[in-house]
Amino acid sequence: MAHSQNSLELPININATQITTAYGHRALPKLKEELQSEDLQTRQKALMALCDLMHDPECIYKAMNIGCMENLKALLKDSNSMVRIKTTEVLHITASHSVGRYAFLEHDIVLALSFLLNDPSPVCRGNLYKAYMQLVQVPRGAQEIISKGLISSLVWKLQVEVEEEEFQEFILDTLVLCLQEDATEALGSNVVLVLKQKLLSANQNIRSKAARALLNVSISREGKKQVCHFDVIPILVHLLKDPVEHVKSNAAGALMFATVITEGKYAALEAQAIGLLLELLHSPMTIARLNATKALTMLAEAPEGRKALQTHVPTFRAMEVETYEKPQVAEALQRAARIAISVIEFKP
């Protein structure tokens, strides 16, 4: 005959870290209370529940309205590493939504997060980098990071996170969009030297993102001068032979800006850039062809470059009449080809 017996063990399918959330509209207010609990396990469980809820933009909006963001800011200073990890996870999920990015800006989360840049937990730092990467997808987010003076810190972290290549990618993604807004602080933080080192990475994503960052650095005159001064151009030219199309495209884009100044033109000519850029005109990537055309146009402004490109005018004439599926792509490439021809055929 069977006997009933109460076990002292939890059922095998019960997760002790999960919290029972209140029903309906009471769920978030209840979690807000538990985020402020003095009991460590209660705080941890509330954060785990929030990690699930914050995938819903409506929940982010409600959480922001009842003051959860201030509670999360406070938990970034918690002495328990798991609390900090789960708090940064909630925040990076939040930053992946437009309403969440607005919450970041409204509640000054960017600066609060920055105090964890040197957190001993790599998971915590990884969540932080992902949150910043999500935030800069809008110009206001990039401007916020710049205004808080965090660019130099991110440049430094790009150097020291050598064991975590994924973290380097997150930081580079963040820097690319920040540099597009303003490269002043970065240029004062040796960003060109740091990016030069990353161009030599064995990781193709890091090489590509570093070249893209240098493209944005080179928009300003000071950036162009530093790229020339630190001998970055020969490395960019070498990357035109990279097996990865994105790397070649971004390297050509960086050269396109760096060769605007005379020093850049002659550095690229000395590095034999013309032949490699001409090969890139046949790339399957439209942006690579456009970048290469514009870079060659810059080199044609130098007498030596113009002379070397004289025999390649038919290539550009073919681009002028080439058809593409997208009208805007056709217009951009055809216009770039026309300008290249006019510069190459210019008679001083």
UniProtKB/Swiss-Prot annotation:
- Swiss-Prot/TrEMBL keywords: Cell projection, Cilium, Cytoplasm, Cytoskeleton, Flagellum, Repeat
- One GO CC annotation: radial spoke
SUPFAM superfamilies per record:
ARM repeat (SSF48371)
Q: In which tissues is it expressed?
A: Expressed in adult cerebellum, spinal cord, spleen, skeletal muscle and some/5 out of 9 rhabdoid tumors. Detected in fetal brain, lung, liver and kidney.
**Which compartments does it reside in?**
Cytoplasm, Cytoskeleton, Flagellum axoneme
What InterPro entries would the database entry show? ARM-like, ARM-type_fold, Armadillo, RSP14
The keyword Transmembrane helix appears for this protein: no
Q: Report each ARM repeat as a residue range.
A: 16-55, 57-96, 99-137, 139-179, 180-219, 221-260, 262-301, 303-346
State a single Pfam family of this protein.
Answer: Arm
- Tell me the leader sequence span: none
Main localization is cytoplasm
State the PANTHER family in the record.
Answer: RADIAL SPOKE HEAD 14 HOMOLOG, RTDR1
Function, as annotated: Functions as part of axonemal radial spoke complexes that play an important part in the motility of sperm and cilia.
Q: How does it assemble?
A: Component of the axonemal radial spoke complex 1 (RS1), at least composed of spoke head proteins RSPH1, RSPH3, RSPH9 and the cilia-specific component RSPH4A or sperm-specific component RSPH6A, spoke stalk proteins RSPH14, DNAJB13, DYDC1, ROPN1L and NME5, and the anchor protein IQUB.
Q: Which family does it belong to?
A: Belongs to the flagellar radial spoke RSP14 family.
Tell me the protein's name: Radial spoke head 14 homolog
Per the record, the gene is RSPH14
